[in-house]
Amino acid sequence: MAYSYEQLEQWDKQYVWHPFTQMKQYAKERPLIIERGQGSYLYDVDGNRYLDGYASLWVNVHGHNDPELNAALREQLEKIAHSTLLGSANVPSILLAKRLLEYWPHMSKVFYSDTGAAAVEIALKIAYQYWKNIDPVQYAKKNKFVSLKEAYHGDTVGAVSVGGMETFHRIFAPLLFERIEVPSPYVYRMDEYGSEQEIVGYCLRELERVLEEQHDQIAAVVIEPLVQGAAGIIVHPRGFLKGVERLCRRYGVLFICDEVAVGFGRAGTMFACEQEEVKPDLVCLGKGITGGYLPLAATLVTEEIYAAFLGDVDEDKTFYHGHTYTGNQLTCSVALKNIELIEKRGLIDSVKRKARRLAEWLERLYEIPIVGDIRQKGLMCGIEIVKDRRTKEVFPRAAMVEHRIILEARRRGLVIRPLGPVLTFIPVLSMSEDEMAEAVRILFDSLACLYEQARAELL
């Protein structure tokens, strides 16, 4: 049965509460209602097409409606859709775990979940219980976690506890466990600390100071390797990630790497940790794991950590955590095919090549005076919008400049999203160079249009 746009708009606004959305503002606007996708494009119910410039929230790898991923899903659906992993196993989850660990040979076990936030939540709980399982007396105080300024690791209570984004997390402060914040190398806004490497040195010294003083109370350090995504695509200079790992080893705290956003080719390698030869104790995977098809996440751990949970039943060393759809056959089957296609299609080399071209095209955006900084790692791009380049002052939130830019881009055929004052361009990984060039052209024209409006209204 076909429904008119007007009917769908009415029901959407009447019945659906959208995530991370101020619904009062949403109700005033004409919503984008997607009906289908093909390749790098999304199509709305009226047949208009849009380049998917945010990879449907950073998840899409091979494009929409990929025939091989579709076939893998159908093949599994003909066998079974779901059976529990609590006390029993299934074929796709076994094969996927084996496949993932081929990329992480120092790891030994895979614990499945369904969202990146859940993968982080699991990592935090494992890290906490690990110390208690080893020696609850000696490690009784190892209850704290360290994370970066402006950290974002998801929106469950544990993940929010290690988050540092004031806008998102402030209201929930009374619900959260204790977190220690350390500075992040946000180069664009840390001029006073000197060069990139001087900024890295400062941040690592601050982390070492915390670890030196409180290592006996800290269970783990958790970071997004190389790029803080939701913070506005803050790209860490080379050496920071490796430096954090060294400090964790020196002071005897666990190291958790949240690869949810940066993994599966997004940052230019299959996994971000490869770029600095880092071997964390726990790794969180999600987003691109199924190529953008279905919700799946995983937490990988070393044998040393896993072994701490082994014991007799009455020792209570069991990890009492699990989700209803943990290790679901449909999700694991499509994830297996996704990894196979990443390799077969040479996707990682393609991402590296396209990232170099994209960096060249993005430079033109600096011609627009409200573009303060452009940050990129692989196919993750952040364009920071400022009112004044000299002072780096941003526009007032109430002016909604960034929101107006994305609406203008949508009108021209590109879907993107802002993160505070930062426009993010996170394309489908398989997007062609011609399509990316078109996306950047739309970005330029949209920015130019809003600059003229802002100059008249706000500058």
Mark where each language-model region is.
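Conserved N-terminal phosphate-binding loop of PLP-dependent enzymes in the Aspartate aminotransferase
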Residues: M1-L459
